[in-house]
UniProtKB/Swiss-Prot annotation:
Molecular function GO terms recorded: protein kinase binding
Keyword terms, alphabetized: Cell cycle, Cell division, Cyclin
This protein's record includes keyword Cell division: yes
Highest rank taxon of the organism: Eukaryota
Designated name of the protein: Cyclin-U4-2
Length: 216
């Protein structure tokens, strides 16, 4: 099946292990900006705001970055799952414009997107009860959120190689922007490693495609 081929190729194109912490930081930074912007935009219309299962009763005290680092530490899913989860979140935003990502739902959307991504991408993954514990919610809530999320993205789980690479490039730009303001990161190594890995994987993909074409 086509989606199985895409899964295999995406796993082959995982970000290099040494830069994954920076990928997590970049994703956190993007989601932080989105949630803060939507908080400001929705404040005048708070009384008419649509409520969903993703909205927490109170804003979680843990930061988005710390929350994602916790998931990264304990979920033990493949690195590509986080890129795919990011893609799923974007699909959710596009398909559910009345449920923008904000500080009340971003944490639950993150844990759910990673769960759904891990189940689709990885051969082995933890169950909902484990993810619920990592995410600080009940298993019943995790089950409900998973179902709501799947319906929210229209069950569009497959990710093409080109889409995956586009989002990798987006995160790469975010990582580069962060290095401009943080002397603790190493921009030259970061960009070179990420770009080299993408080029290698794109070459491998072209090589596979040529083999498939010659075999037909």
């Amino acid at each position: 099946m086509a989606y199985q081929i895409d899964q295999k190729m995406i796993h082959d194109q995982e970000p290099m292990a040494e830069i994954m912490p920076n990928v997590i930081t970049a994703m956190s930074s993007l989601l932080q900006r989105v949630s803060e912007t939507n908080d400001d935009l929705s404040r005048p219309f708070r009384e008419h705001k649509r409520i969903s299962a993703f909205n927490a009763v109170t804003k979680p005290s843990i930061s988005i970055r710390s929350y994602m680092e916790r998931i990264f530490k304990y979920a033990d899913c493949s690195d590509s799952c986080y890129i795919v989860a990011y893609i799923y979140l974007d699909r959710f935003i596009q398909k559910q414009p009345l449920l923008p990502i904000d500080s009340s739902n971003v944490h639950r959307l993150i844990i759910t997107s990673v769960l759904v991504s891990a189940k689709f991408m990885d051969d082995l993954c933890y169950n909902n009860a484990f993810y619920a514990k990592v995410g600080g919610i009940t298993t019943e809530e995790m089950n409900l959120l998973e179902l709501d999320f799947l319906f929210g993205i229209g069950f569009q789980l497959n990710v093409t190689i080109s889409t995956y690479n586009d989002y990798c490039s987006s995160l790469q730009r975010e990582m580069v922007m962060r290095t401009m303001y943080s002397p603790l990161l190493e921009p030259a190594f970061l960009v070179r490693s990420f770009h080299k890995n993408l080029l290698k994987n794109l070459y491998d993909e072209d090589h596979r495609n040529s083999q498939v074409t010659s075999a037909v």
